[in-house]
Amino acid sequence: MEQLLHYVWKHKIFLLMPLQTTSGQPVEVIDPGLLNTDAGPDFFNAKLKINGTLWVGNVELHTQASDWFRHGHNRDTVYDNVILHVVGESDCEVYYANGGIVPQLLLHCPDNVRQRYDELRQTEIYPPCYSILASLPKLTVHSWLSALQVERFEQKAQAIAARLERCNNHWEDVFFITLARNLGFGLNGDAFEAWAAHLPFRAVDKHRDSLFQVEAFFLGQAGLLEEDWQEDCYYRELQKEFHYLQRKFELSAPVSGDWWRFLRLRPGNFPHVRLAQLAWLYHKEQSLFSRVMAAETAEDIKKIISARTSPYWETHFTFKKSSPHQEKRLGENALNLILINTVIPFLYAYGMHRADERLCDRATCFLEALKAENNHVTRLWSGAGLPVYTAADSQALLQLQKEYCDRKDCLRCRFGYEYLRGKK
């Protein structure tokens, strides 16, 4: 209820009857103020006329007036600058810390707004606002998707910053860890990130010129060289090499091989293949992050990250069992997903870190130039009448689903705002 009161106040969706305080003084809302997302009153710098006198200050909203006391505002001088207490139910008078009476307004939510809000909250259909999407003005759609895209960029930049802190601000390491996670393509994403974060990068770097030794490091630390398969010569060689590297660098125990999931995976996405591709890439590109950040075009980046494998994996998806010869290269779709989920967020985050707008703009341009992702979220929105053309669109819709639709947070959504206005 309080969220709905916030919405009605913020957008000045008032009934036609004049507003007045519970003591009968007329109220004119010139500016409802700025929503405060931190501690303190709910709206800052509101501009109101109460009984003909202009007031500028803060506004606090509650479902019930008595919430003022439950929250301790009557003992908190921070709330002494509240010029109006807006409530859904006026069950008592409220007071400042100095004992003065706080002007109070009983705000009624229009029935049609409440009904539409209940529709959005209770429907099982996704997206809940499907009935208005096709009729929304293009400018409304474009501006909201653009804002969501920036919001998603900023969230991913924060996640990268958190990884940087854990990795002593080593951009190359964090880029590789994020790349590894995204090569898990969802099902094995957590396992790949945990494995990559567990890698002794400086030890691996000492043997980076040898693809065989990098593979031994990667597969061994992934817990995939723990069994005794005498019949596979390449496996035995990798295992022997890994045991040598373990002793040389006093490596910590590998992650558990049980972390890796194979069910419902296409063989090309098996962990062994992805680890072999990462090993090849780590061996080939000794300054991977730096090269990617310096690349001018998306096609140049694809050439840099276009990984293959050592010859053994051209006839294997796992150890022991051979398969028909096939080069295990990253396909076009996989490269696009790596661009969308790894490279482009890093361009943006690195641009923010260096205050380099050129990198941030490049990230946006790359995203707008790539085709939209084809997944269940984009298909649902497209089916509801919202065109999805570029990766910028699809990333914005993923943000919308995660941060708004799944949380039923329609009051902060611009599509939800249009729905509540009655555009049906």
Annotate each PLM feature:
Residues M1-H6:
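N-terminal "leader" segments that precede or initiate the main folded domain
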Residues Y7-S66, Y79:
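N-terminal ordered "arm"
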Residues I30-P32, P41-A46, S66-H71, E89-C92, ...:
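Short alpha-helical segments and helix-capping/turn motifs at coil-helix boundaries
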Residues F44, L54-W55, E60, S66-N98, ...:
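N-terminal accessory interaction module
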Residues A65-D67, S90-C92, D111-V113, F185, ...:
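Short loop/turn segments at secondary-structure transitions that flank enzyme active sites
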Residues V82, V86-W144:
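Compact, glycine/acidic-enriched structural inserts
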Residues L148-A396, D409:
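Hydrophobic, aromatic-lined core segments that form the binding pocket/scaffold
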Residues Q395-K424:
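Cysteine-cluster motifs in flexible loop/terminal segments that predominantly coordinate metals
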